[in-house]
Amino acid sequence: MKQVVVATKNMGKVREFAELFERFDLEVKSLHDFPHIEEVEETGETFEENAILKADSLSRQLNAIVIADDSGLIVDALNGKPGVYSARFAGEPKDDQANIDKVLQELNDVAFEKRKARFYCALAVAFPEGDKKPVIVNGTCEGFILEQRRGENGFGYDPIFYVEEYKKAMAELSSDEKNAISHRGRALRKLEEKIPEWFLGE
């Protein structure tokens, strides 16, 4: 079975990748399977830069195909924040609930119709062969920021992200519903079209 390493210790992300790739004969591993490897510091100024940085560095260290994503929440009324700082918007250590609280606080006096936002995902795949350039794709999911949390599913900002298509918060969606419209799901479907056949095991 072919193997790919997902460059994260976030088990929510790992589950999404595993579910989206389960129809392929592909074993998905995460950084939890390689405890000696340190996570790459995200020093890029864009989601794409961070994704390539992580995928490339870890692919060389592990001599493996590595998928890295950098994703986050972009809120128009906050001039694009939290953006590339989404995971640590409220500071270190990373804390989903504190990040949500900070977004809600900063949008406190903003009317719902002006709380437009989107989830953005940049996905990079790096190969151990030096002559193969990383593959990069992206996906977005449009929505609005709710005034309070809803739902128990998902992770990150899902409880405050309202998806008009379903009239629900992202955290109220089933895995299948989320994968159909999520930024990561859309990016992965683009990836399927770009990845060489030997990677997908078809």
From Swiss-Prot:
Task: List positions binding substrate.
Answer: 8-13, 71, 155-158, 178, 183-184
Q: Which residues form the active site?
A: 70 (proton acceptor)
Q: Which cofactor does it need?
A: Mg(2+)
Catalysed reactions, semicolon-separated: XTP + H2O = XMP + diphosphate + H(+); dITP + H2O = dIMP + diphosphate + H(+); ITP + H2O = IMP + diphosphate + H(+)
Output the Gene Ontology terms for molecular function: dITP diphosphatase activity; ITP diphosphatase activity; metal ion binding; nucleotide binding; ribonucleoside triphosphate phosphatase activity; XTP diphosphatase activity
Its top-level enzyme class, in one word, is: hydrolase
Cofactor: how and how many bound: Binds 1 Mg(2+) ion per subunit.
Q: Name one Pfam family in it.
A: Ham1p_like
Give the GO biological process terms: nucleotide metabolic process; purine nucleoside triphosphate catabolic process
Coiled-coil region:
none
- Recite the UniProt keywords alphabetically: Hydrolase, Magnesium, Metal-binding, Nucleotide metabolism, Nucleotide-binding
Superkingdom assignment: Bacteria
GO CC terms for this protein?
A: cytosol
- Where along this sequence does the record place binding of Mg(2+)? 41, 70
Q: Which InterPro entries match?
A: dITP/XTP_pyrophosphatase (IPR020922), ITPase-like_fam (IPR029001), RdgB/HAM1 (IPR002637)
User: What's the EC number here?
Assistant: 3.6.1.66
What family, per the record?
Belongs to the HAM1 NTPase family.
Function according to Swiss-Prot or TrEMBL: Pyrophosphatase that catalyzes the hydrolysis of nucleoside triphosphates to their monophosphate derivatives, with a high preference for the non-canonical purine nucleotides XTP (xanthosine triphosphate), dITP (deoxyinosine triphosphate) and ITP. Seems to function as a house-cleaning enzyme that removes non-canonical purine nucleotides from the nucleotide pool, thus preventing their incorporation into DNA/RNA and avoiding chromosomal lesions.
Task: Describe, as the record does, how this protein assembles with itself and its partners.
Answer: Homodimer.
Name of the featured protein: dITP/XTP pyrophosphatase
Native source species? Bacillus cereus (strain ATCC 10987 / NRS 248)
